[in-house]
A protein has these predicted regions:
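Short helix-loop-beta connector
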Residues: 137-140
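Gly/Ala-rich beta-loop-alpha elbow adjacent to hydrolase catalytic centers
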Residues: 144-149, 153
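Alpha/beta-hydrolase active-site loop
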Residues: 115-135
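Active-site signature of alpha/beta-hydrolase-fold catalytic machinery across serine-
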Residues: 155-160
Length: 173
């Protein structure tokens, strides 16, 4: 004899599970300040409007002469590449001997509603790359773009091949 499952009890169990997950989620959100991300030391070296350029701090001399400029998405935060000391792309790249810069466009607000891709690519990205080139006395940088920053990097490298030595677009689809 087969026992039929009571759909009402099944629904109540699912509602209870969802309520528990929501309660846990609210608890996590209430304690976000206690979570420390982006722990790899960096220094702001350039800014224009609300766009900032950070240089990650090295404890040794870089093994690679040409620095890497990382362009990230406008919506997500570049901190996603530096979650914890043992889960940090930035820390790993530094450990591999690279000199790393990252561009922070800040959170878009209504004030930026008239900015175009041209502004972000041919003004902010170009100015940040020129700063790095001049600081190091070099003609070209290595350019790494992640998410929307990958798209920006591909476009930038096509427009300014004289400034981009190596292009690494990541998840730029």
């Amino acid at each position: 004899m087969r026992i039929m499952e009571n759909p009402f009890i099944s629904l109540l169990e699912k509602v209870s599970q969802t309520t528990q997950k929501l309660t846990q989620g609210v608890s996590v959100l209430n304690n976000l300040d206690a979570i420390e991300i982006g722990t790899t030391e960096k220094e702001q070296v350039w800014s224009c409007d609300k766009v900032k350029l950070y240089r990650y701090q090295r404890t040794t001399e870089p093994l690679v002469k040409t620095p890497v400029v990382v362009s990230y998405a406008l919506i997500n935060r570049f901190h996603m590449m530096d979650l914890q000391p043992d889960r940090s792309l930035m820390r790993k790249l530094l450990d591999l001997g690279l000199d790393i810069y990252v561009i922070d466009t800040g959170y878009p607000t209504r004030n930026e509603r008239y900015l175009t891709m041209n502004d972000y690519i041919n003004y902010y990205l170009d100015e940040a790359i020129d700063f790095v080139r001049e600081s190091h006395g070099i003609d070209k940088v290595n350019l790494m773009g992640i998410c929307q920053g990958g798209t920006f990097s591909v476009i930038y490298s096509a427009i300014h091949p004289e400034k981009s030595k190596t292009l690494l677009p990541c998840h730029s689809g």
